[in-house]
């Protein structure tokens, strides 16, 4: 989790947990159904749905399963009463944490989220307590490319910013509504998109030391273990030196 990379620091991913296909598939299907319900089943006109489809495909979900989930969202049914809820709180070291949930039972969800904060030395805040520290953005990851050519293509496609990373990759930021069109423009210019999603970008970050970094990672792990939690965002910054000791 390199300190220079927002992509690496914003969301902590656990490969071992993601390998539990049943659990991750359940969350992916929920997002597909909800995205289709809210914005319709046309991927080209629904950025949230397109991001959900891309994520499902990257996790080896079949097209048939994806299409069935979209059809359920468009057609209605027992599983389309899911609602998105954002919980905000404070994690170890004074970090700001936002927890995006998809649930049909708010009481059940809060009973999962609140203890996770408490057990890790944090506390669940009120609505708006840390949300002002984040901005909703589209984020595109390019593994490697010629910087000048990619910058030109990204600007032409409507990107807001492009940031080269120490490992040779590039992070491209867009207005979240423009994620799909910017991605299309970049791909049309011949570049391969490794990952693209709507995310929350912190305006400020908190440097974590060897004592606080493991506590934040434990909090993220506990939250991601909750069935109703879709995404966890934070503003913790873990530098390479600290990460190498974890």
UniProtKB/Swiss-Prot annotation:
UniProt cross-references to InterPro entries, sorted A to Z: Integrase-like_N (IPR017856), TACO1_YebC-like_2nd/3rd_dom (IPR048300), TACO1_YebC_N (IPR049083), Transcrip_reg_TACO1-like (IPR002876), Transcrip_reg_TACO1-like_dom3 (IPR026564), YebC-like (IPR029072)
Predominant cellular place of this UniProt entry's protein: cytoplasm
Record's keyword terms, sorted: Cytoplasm, DNA-binding, Transcription, Transcription regulation
GO molecular function, one term: DNA binding
GO cellular component terms attached to this protein's record: cytosol
One biological process term in Gene Ontology: regulation of DNA-templated transcription
Disulfide bonds, paired cysteine numbers: none
Pfam families assigned: TACO1_YebC_N, Transcrip_reg
Gene3D superfamilies for this protein: 1.10.10.200, 3.30.70.980
Subcellular location: Cytoplasm
Coiled coil: none
Record keyword Transcription present: yes
PANTHER family: TRANSCRIPTIONAL REGULATORY PROTEIN YEBC-RELATED, TRANSLATIONAL ACTIVATOR OF CYTOCHROME C OXIDASE 1
Family: Belongs to the TACO1 family.
Record-given protein name: Probable transcriptional regulatory protein HI_0315
Protein species of origin: Haemophilus influenzae (strain ATCC 51907 / DSM 11121 / KW20 / Rd)
């Amino acid at each position: 989790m390199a300190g220079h990379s927002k992509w690496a620091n914003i969301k902590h991913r656990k490969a071992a947990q993601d390998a539990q296909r049943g659990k991750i598939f359940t969350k992916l299907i929920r997002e597909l159904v909800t995205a289709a319900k809210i914005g319709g089943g046309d991927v080209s006109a629904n950025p949230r749905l397109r991001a959900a489809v891309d994520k499902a495909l990257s996790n080896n979900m079949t097209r048939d399963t994806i299409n069935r989930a979209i059809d359920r969202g468009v057609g209605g049914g027992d599983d389309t009463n899911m609602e998105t809820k954002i919980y905000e709180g404070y994690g170890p070291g004074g970090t700001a944490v936002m927890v995006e949930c998809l649930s049909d039972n708010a009481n059940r969800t809060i009973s999962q989220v609140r203890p996770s904060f408490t057990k890790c030395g944090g506390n669940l805040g009120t609505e708006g307590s840390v949300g002002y520290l984040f901005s909703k953005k589209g984020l595109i990851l390019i593994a490697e490319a010629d910087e000048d050519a990619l910058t030109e293509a990204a600007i032409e496609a409507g990107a807001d910013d492009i940031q080269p990373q120490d490992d040779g990759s590039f992070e491209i930021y867009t207005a979240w509504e423009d994620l799909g069109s910017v991605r299309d423009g970049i791909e049309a210019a011949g570049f391969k998109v490794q990952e693209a999603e709507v995310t929350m970008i912190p305006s400020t970050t908190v440097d974590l030391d060897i004592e606080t970094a493991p506590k934040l990672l434990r909090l993220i792990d506990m939250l991601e273990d909750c069935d109703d939690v879709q995404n966890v965002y934070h503003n913790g910054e873990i530098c390479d030196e600290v990460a190498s000791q974890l």
